[in-house]
Amino acid sequence: MWLRLGPPSLSLSPKPTVGRSLCLTLWFLSLALRASTQAPAPTVNTHFGKLRGARVPLPSEILGPVDQYLGVPYAAPPIGEKRFLPPEPPPSWSGIRNATHFPPVCPQNIHTAVPEVMLPVWFTANLDIVATYIQEPNEDCLYLNVYVPTEDVKRISKECARKPNKKICRKGGSGAKKQGEDLADNDGDEDEDIRDSGAKPVMVYIHGGSYMEGTGNMIDGSILASYGNVIVITLNYRVGVLGFLSTGDQAAKGNYGLLDQIQALRWVSENIAFFGGDPRRITVFGSGIGASCVSLLTLSHHSEGLFQRAIIQSGSALSSWAVNYQPVKYTSLLADKVGCNVLDTVDMVDCLRQKSAKELVEQDIQPARYHVAFGPVIDGDVIPDDPEILMEQGEFLNYDIMLGVNQGEGLKFVEGVVDPEDGVSGTDFDYSVSNFVDNLYGYPEGKDTLRETIKFMYTDWADRDNPETRRKTLVALFTDHQWVEPSVVTADLHARYGSPTYFYAFYHHCQSLMKPAWSDAAHGDEVPYVFGVPMVGPTDLFPCNFSKNDVMLSAVVMTYWTNFAKTGDPNKPVPQDTKFIHTKANRFEEVAWSKYNPRDQLYLHIGLKPRVRDHYRATKVAFWKHLVPHLYNLHDMFHYTSTTTKVPPPDTTHSSHITRRPNGKTWSTKRPAISPAYSNENAQGSWNGDQDAGPLLVENPRDYSTELSVTIAVGASLLFLNVLAFAALYYRKDKRRQEPLRQPSPQRGAGAPELGAAPEEELAALQLGPTHHECEAGPPHDTLRLTALPDYTLTLRRSPDDIPLMTPNTITMIPNSLVGLQTLHPYNTFAAGFNSTGLPHSHSTTRV
């Protein structure tokens, strides 16, 4: 900080004192030094006009200044008739546009009940601070911020820390290594010049939230840009009602927030070269909901050619909250609240356009727990089909992908039922699992089996009575289901055909009062390390007590992330070396982050003791991926396999299925409405909240009949699969034995090919005898797909009352029970030509 001195006195003195002369001299020197160090404001041309930014120094000797261009428009304001429509390119401007202030944020409301379970801890713990970032929202909000490094200081700082007498250090320290400067004087060091001397890689950050809130203004990309020598871009996109409202037809197709992101990427691809960026090395990255957006962008053919790599932090398109399968339901609720619920969807949308943005975003529309009210939808265009189907079809194989999870992502799911001092009681544990099953899976006939199996899998039987152990396993339950399993499945599908894939597990978090002391690395805890916050100290959003270890780990993470943006390999070109920060050797120097593949499933453990490990939580991933979908429909198999098992009588004590919050505590999540499939008979057996339920039963002694039923059910399932496997193997063996007998003679077989007869022969051979009646329940080809059980996973990701998946050419998200909407049209029948921007919704849904 400059020493601020006042001007000298104008009174004349025949004999000025020495102190006055010294003061005057220092004042002039200060002015001269300030004038000499003040760099001119940087300017840059774009296709739409000229921008004036600001050169901002960073408060660290190892970080060079960054040119910031804030509030750059990437699309026309989506206001008036353009609300609920895809974005259009921005208008051009004359003269020089000032880009030195953050733009307005998109309309949102954080004063209602925010879905804390999907938001990072640093967001929910600082809502008062977050509110200062979203003041004065405006629908004219489609802007981005560009952070451009001016010096490549990381390598020179490390060299000067180790060899302060080197010539490049004597020339002016970190400021000596200017862009384009010749570093021939490398003193013979082999790895002296490892920087990008040409166009710089570009990293575009998609902010998270819950699709309802957030802004790119909250994240400063300066440190990441300076340390990693990359251009970092943050952006705003429409959120909530304005970004994701959908009527399920052409009136309002939805996905406007995703289309904003695509338009921003198009702007970056066309203009980043003016900033010194490389349009052929654009990486999109995000955390949480932002990661889900990144995952969805890799599956949309409208993103093709706009970026080459993706970093998916703690999220996936396969998570239950990634896609909204019931948009019409929540659109109807919103229309009811604001007086626009008319039968014709076009009239409904016109009515919603007449409402103010404030009135729309202030409506409290709460989704089912673990789902979203307004988010991306399967529209047959931007998202052509269910994300898992698109992944299986290889839609994202052209991208290099790095993805991972944090150790304790599910903290917020547990905090509401946990006493930080005492852990989780047995009753709380049982209630949490029951509530989880009810809200996520609805009320299937096999709910009891599903619930008890989950409780069985997440009980530490060596320490089952320890409340702290229950707390740990409960966090693991939510972490595994909501983050780990979707991420691992995404990695498996991407790496199946050899596409570059890297997986990590983040095990570190800063010390702060935002979280309980017992918590691990929670959702969003990797964000400050990715953006280098420990290097400059605590901030308003990240009030942590950062140590040298935090600074070192942040440097490591930024090196991995920017290396991946540069080459697609997090190990190169910049090696892990942080001796200029920490005197101790960096353990990451000896760790090589291996590629992920479905067989070995290698991943990097990111923490103070890094190591490459394999098969991250493989047992739990297999449980959620394979067994739970099978148990979800297990009752269907019992109809024809369980003929000797006696069904236990219904429990009349209401103790095993009670959903009342024990000990008088309140539970913030409402039980979903009973679906039509839930019979009156079952409803009569449920607990009535208006009547006195009596005291809860003590946990011990415990009735193990349910666990025994679960064991028998699982055993029956495995026996059934073994029968199928034996039948398939027997058939293949018998077929091979008969192949020589079926081989036609050369004279008879020369006239007609064998291909035409093969399907009929296989079909006849698959018709087994009467002793194999279990195998006749489905088509033959389903019987032999032993490694691919009936895929109920798509159903389980949906809300309890969702409809089955239909073909991409039909509406896939409208419940049959919704009354009052007109007949909808296939997505490939839109009239072309209403949108001249080259954006989606005017194109065919068929990829050429």
Curated annotation (Swiss-Prot):
Belongs to the type-B carboxylesterase/lipase family. It comes from Homo sapiens (Human). Residues 645-656, 677-689 have a biased composition (Polar residues). Residues 1-37 form the signal peptide. Homodimer, and heterodimer with NLGN1 and NLGN2. Interacts with neurexins NRXN1, NRXN2 and NRXN3. Interaction with neurexins is mediated by heparan sulfate glycan modification on neurexin. Interacts (via its C-terminus) with DLG4/PSD-95 (via PDZ domain 3). Residues 38-709 are extracellular. This is Neuroligin-3. Residues 170-195, 645-694 are annotated as: Disordered. It is linked to Autism, X-linked 1: A complex multifactorial, pervasive developmental disorder characterized by impairments in reciprocal social interaction and communication, restricted and stereotyped patterns of interests and activities, and the presence of developmental abnormalities by 3 years of age. Most individuals with autism also manifest moderate intellectual disability. Residues 182-194 have a biased composition (Acidic residues). It is found in: Cell membrane; Synapse. The chain crosses the membrane at residues 710-730. Gene3D superfamilies: alpha/beta hydrolase. The keyword Cell membrane applies.
